[in-house]
Amino acid sequence: MKKLIALLFAGVSLMTQNTKAQLMAGTARVNITPQGKESVHDSVYARSLVLQSGQLRFAFVSVDLAVFTSERIEKICKEKYGISQVMLCSSHNHSEPQPDGKRSFQQGNPFTVYYEDQIIKAVGESMAHLFPARITAGRQTFPQLGFNRLIIREDGHARESWFSDDQYTSENPERIPFGPVDPEVGVIRIDDEQGQPRVILMNYACHADIVCFNYAVSADYPGVACRKVEEAFGHGVNCLFVQGAGGNIESLQISSRRKGPDDPFQTDYAPMERTGELLAFQVIKLAKSLGAAATQPPTLQLLEDSLHFTGRFNKKLDYNVHLSTIIINNTIAIAACPGELFVQLQLDWKKKMELAGVTPLLFGYTWSKGNWPGYIADVRSAALGGYGADQGDNLIEVGAGEAMITRQLANFYRLNGLMRDKPGPVGFKGGAQWIIKPFKP
């Protein structure tokens, strides 16, 4: 068996494994709900998936937190478990634990170390229970659960859906399906050698803020969806939710917002439950249709890269944005990106990836190294404006999203071997001759 190939060039780290290596997978689920003063409606979890082929070993960790990054997790998992990369995939639930109003991404959050320890524990448990694995993936379109919350108004600019005017009601209670959205859900199914499903990973683009301002801990609709999928498959199946490019996508069903923790008005969790159920139904149906994975030797490839950007308004800002490009079995392409990408970027990338004949999955809100870039609007959305598009002085420069997607596309073709690193062969050869004969009707 050939050794792992590791190439370093221009800030790019490429890792790929020979097809003769056995593909191994491990998974674990750990409750990360801290002991705090807040009431708990439903627990939040860290669900990990480790993939290994030869010397290449990396982990996805889906966390029920708004935004979570940690260099400590990366360091310890590399030293303790030989993990080359840990990708933290935040579901972006707005009802995460918030001690004294602090979010998971804010400095001084007293639960940060606890979260880190629990996530490291999940990765360790995954490593302790590796099994020979087979992987399949698919995607399907179904009636949209979300809408584009940046609604174009009379002056030609867009405003966020919670901004009302003479024509639109705050929070879109009429459930008008504004677009663009991505109505597809993507699914990765991982089986053991007996054909028993062990892991279901769902990839969907929609904000997890149905019960925002509920002043209680909840994993929101992703938590409901994961629970329903796990119940449907049973046998200890673990279900990971990975957010897509849902930066400007809001759920069509939301709960009315409370004004504060002492507000006598109570949060209605029915919209959250129903949205999670609808998503889970599609995921279960798709996962079951995938059936057993092909028996050919699996392949696993990973390429890490980074790009630097400045701010749109504040040119003193420096965003070091790390990207991961993954190809599994030459048929599954994953573009992992940090930040809150707008959905048009996902639609554009997937359209280009269709030409490659692969199942494309964009993992948004997925951090491995570097800075968290916040909202990342496509160029048109940046021009139209609205929340996350032109509000705030810490926004990333215009065009950063397109640059990230273009780099992901180029890195995919580097990984699959089509992108040459030297000039290609010249096709023309001198001396070729032909004779043109007139055609007589």
Model-assigned labels for residue ranges:
Residues M1-Q22:
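Bacterial Sec-dependent N-terminal signal peptides
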Residues A21-N238, G244-A245, I249-D263, T267-R274, ...:
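Conserved beta-alpha junction segments in alpha/beta enzyme cores
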